[in-house]
A protein has these predicted regions:
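Extended, low-polarity transmembrane helix blocks
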Residues: 1-27, 37, 45-53, 57-129
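Cytosolic, membrane-interface loops and tails of multi-pass inner-membrane proteins
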Residues: 32-39
C-alpha cells in the first residue's frame, strides 16, 4: 500500500471515533451538558455545542479529506483540555485510576495521530489540501 492510501486509511480510522462520539451525545444532550457542568465546565451547553461541532464536523472533515489538516489540528488542540479534565487519573479514586489512565494514554495516542495527519504530505488523497 503506498503512503497516499495509508494516509487516507489513517484519516478514515481517526474520523470514526469523533463522528460516533458526537452522534452519541446528541440524544443525551442535557445529560452530557449536566456531566460537563459537574466537571466544572462553564456554560456547559455552549461548550457541548462546540464539542459537537468539533467532533461531528471535524470528524466528517477528516473522513472526506476536506481541509483535513486544519480539522486534525483543531481536534488535537481541543483534545488537550478534554483529556486533562475528563481523564485526570491522578485525581480519581484508586478503583478508577487504571481506566482513566488508559483513556488518558489513548487520547495522547489519538492526539499523536492527529498531529501526524495535520503535518502529512500533500500527496494524501483528499478533496482539498
Amino acid at each position: 500500500m503506498n503512503s497516499k492510501w495509508q494516509l487516507l486509511l489513517g484519516r478514515v480510522l481517526l474520523s470514526v471515533i469523533f463522528i460516533l462520539s458526537g452522534l452519541g451525545k446528541l440524544p443525551h444532550f442535557h445529560d452530557v451538558a449536566g456531566m460537563m457542568a459537574g466537571k466544572g465546565i462553564p456554560l456547559a451547553s455552549v461548550a457541548l455545542v462546540i464539542t459537537l461541532l468539533i467532533e461531528i464536523g471535524g470528524g466528517l472533515m477528516l473522513l472526506t479529506g476536506y481541509k483535513a489538516r486544519y480539522a486534525a489540528l483543531v481536534i488535537a488542540v481541543w483534545m488537550v483540555p478534554v483529556t486533562l479534565v475528563f481523564h485526570n487519573f491522578w485525581a480519581v479514586p484508586a478503583a478508577q485510576q487504571q481506566d482513566q489512565m488508559i483513556n488518558f494514554l489513548k487520547n495522547l495516542a489519538i492526539i499523536g495521530g492527529l498531529l501526524v495527519t495535520a503535518s502529512a504530505s500533500s500527496a494524501a488523497v483528499t478533496s482539498k489540501k
